[in-house]
């Protein structure tokens, strides 16, 4: 495939975006950008510095002295905050349950969106998040919107937590996902939105490889249309 596309993959929490996006990027030899991890890093730093998560001014000022970096890793991409690896830290419950507050702030989204657009300007990138196709990369050649039932997403998160040695309650995870969905879809700034030209893929009964194959098929079809 000669064309280097911008591929936007959106969807709610635990729909499989990051897992699938990383594999698709590897298969296409594209760059992978986990935008959700960027918001988690900002959330983690605010928590570590004792900043009120609703204080948009202080968090915006904090971003002026914040460095976020990604490095290839297995089984997950490594994430660094100001030179320190925080790959596991940003997946802890305190960050997961607070990140929607940070992601709803206009100043934060403006800064991170500019970083993301700059990274994607030359194409050859797979970017996943909540509003990539609708707001961050509205001109992306390929837009995917992944969905899955709340039960399925809770079970996925449960298995991930158990694999990491984290004690977790399935019903609590379902409640947290429902709350996160509501926050993400109702926030005023860049809510979770399916772009009008995005292709919806229901991953509830699909394996990871099935989803990857479907996205690669969609990309191939986009290539044929060029």
UniProtKB/Swiss-Prot annotation:
ATP binds at residues 11-19. It is found in: Cytoplasm. Keywords: ATP-binding, Cytoplasm, Kinase, Nucleotide-binding, Transferase. One of its GO terms (biological process) is nucleobase-containing small molecule interconversion. Gene3D superfamilies: P-loop containing nucleotide triphosphate hydrolases (3.40.50.300). It catalyses: CMP + ATP = CDP + ADP; dCMP + ATP = dCDP + ADP. One of its GO terms (molecular function) is dCMP kinase activity. Its EC number is 2.7.4.25. Signal peptide: none annotated. It is an enzyme of class 2 (transferase). One of its GO terms (cellular component) is cytosol. Disulfide bonds: none annotated. Belongs to the cytidylate kinase family. Type 1 subfamily. This is Cytidylate kinase.
């Amino acid at each position: 495939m000669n064309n280097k596309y911008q591929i936007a993959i959106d969807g709610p929490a635990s729909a499989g975006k990051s897992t699938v996006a990383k594999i698709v990027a590897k298969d296409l030899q594209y760059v992978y950008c986990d935008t959700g991890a960027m918001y988690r890093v900002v959330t983690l730093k605010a928590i570590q510095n004792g900043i009120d998560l609703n204080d948009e001014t202080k968090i915006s000022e904090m971003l002026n002295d914040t460095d976020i970096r990604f490095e290839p890793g297995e089984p997950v991409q490594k994430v660094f905050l100001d030179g320190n690896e925080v790959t596991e830290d940003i997946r802890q419950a305190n960050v997961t349950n607070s990140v929607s507050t940070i992601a709803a702030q206009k100043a934060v989204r403006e800064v991170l969106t500019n970083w993301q657009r700059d990274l994607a300007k030359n194409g050859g990138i797979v970017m996943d998040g909540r509003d990539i196709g609708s707001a961050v990369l509205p001109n992306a050649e390929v837009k995917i919107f992944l969905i899955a039932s709340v039960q399925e997403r809770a079970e996925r998160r449960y298995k991930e937590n158990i694999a990491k040695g984290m004690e977790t309650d399935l019903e609590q995870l379902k409640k947290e996902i429902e709350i996160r969905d509501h926050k993400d879809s109702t926030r005023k700034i860049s809510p979770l939105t399916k772009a009008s030209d995005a292709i919806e893929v229901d991953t509830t009964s699909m394996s990871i490889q099935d989803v990857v194959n479907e996205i690669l098929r969609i990309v191939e079809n986009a290539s044929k249309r060029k």
